[in-house]
Amino acid sequence: MDNAVDRHVFYISDGTAITAEVLGHAVMSQFPVTISSITLPFVENESRARAVKDQIDAIYHQTGVRPLVFYSIVLPEIRAIILESEGFCQDIVQALVAPLQQEMKLDPTPIAHRTHGLNPNNLNKYDARIAAIDYTLAHDDGISLRNLDQAQVILLGVSRCGKTPTSLYLAMQFGIRAANYPFIADDMDNLVLPASLKPLQHKLFGLTIDPERLAAIREERRENSRYASLRQCRMEVAEVEALYRKNQIPWINSTNYSVEEIATKILDIMGLSRRMY
């Protein structure tokens, strides 16, 4: 077995496999192991299921260690094939459904693709999410200041502090219309809140970042430039943080947080509703 990998982990589904991945990752994060992840969506027929079984078995015979298999599969005949494999198989949905079935005295009615598929009941939500993504792309990095009043949140910050990925995550994951506005080097001589943003102060949220981390990120983009110098980064961060304090704009330091964590903190602090898709 590869010394760099402790366990091989499969995430298998007859749908997108997003549920299997999310729950499986949450479980595996509890263990101090290095994993090699394999995600296999749309395992919807017996021939594909047998190919997946063969893949699991091949890794077992190669390594001598049972692969871990997190699966979410509706059709019993497909499940049965996966369960014949040499993997340690866990039905991540059924583990929760069974006790709920007992508590609610209701039988589940599993349908493939129900969680992340399109159906007449969720088309409006899907359209709203696409509209949020379109809006966010059109208002990235201060490209357009039109219709800013339609934003649910407007992220502020220096270049490369995480505004764009956070905005896109908010739009794609939660259907939030997120604009973002950059403060650039030329702004620093007299940094003030732009007039176009003042009426929308209740929608503003600031991001900052440790200067050392900012310099490292910028160095990858523009090596040996003034833009990436630690001195420049320290000055910009100090100026922007002073602006946040002066205007009472809520803000967080993004240095040690993932995009998911940053987005969740913004939703919580700004009181924005989470939408599930």
UniProtKB/Swiss-Prot annotation:
A GO term for molecular function: phosphotransferase activity, phosphate group as acceptor
Enzyme class at the top of the EC tree: transferase
Pfam families reported for this sequence: Kinase-PPPase (PF03618)
Keyword Cytoplasm attributed: no
Keywords: Kinase, Nucleotide-binding, Serine/threonine-protein kinase, Transferase
Keyword flag Thylakoid: no
Family designation: Belongs to the pyruvate, phosphate/water dikinase regulatory protein family. PSRP subfamily.
UniProt binding sites for ADP: G157, V158, S159, R160, C161, G162, K163, T164
EC number: 2.7.11.33, 2.7.4.28
Protein name: Phosphoenolpyruvate synthase regulatory protein
Catalyzed reactions: [pyruvate, water dikinase] + ADP = [pyruvate, water dikinase]-phosphate + AMP + H(+); [pyruvate, water dikinase]-phosphate + phosphate + H(+) = [pyruvate, water dikinase] + diphosphate
Record-linked NCBIfam families: PRK05339.1 (NF003742)
Cross-referenced InterPro entries: Kinase-pyrophosphorylase (IPR005177), PSRP (IPR026530)
Xref: PANTHER family: PYRUVATE, PHOSPHATE DIKINASE REGULATORY PROTEIN 1, CHLOROPLASTIC
Task of the protein: Bifunctional serine/threonine kinase and phosphorylase involved in the regulation of the phosphoenolpyruvate synthase (PEPS) by catalyzing its phosphorylation/dephosphorylation.
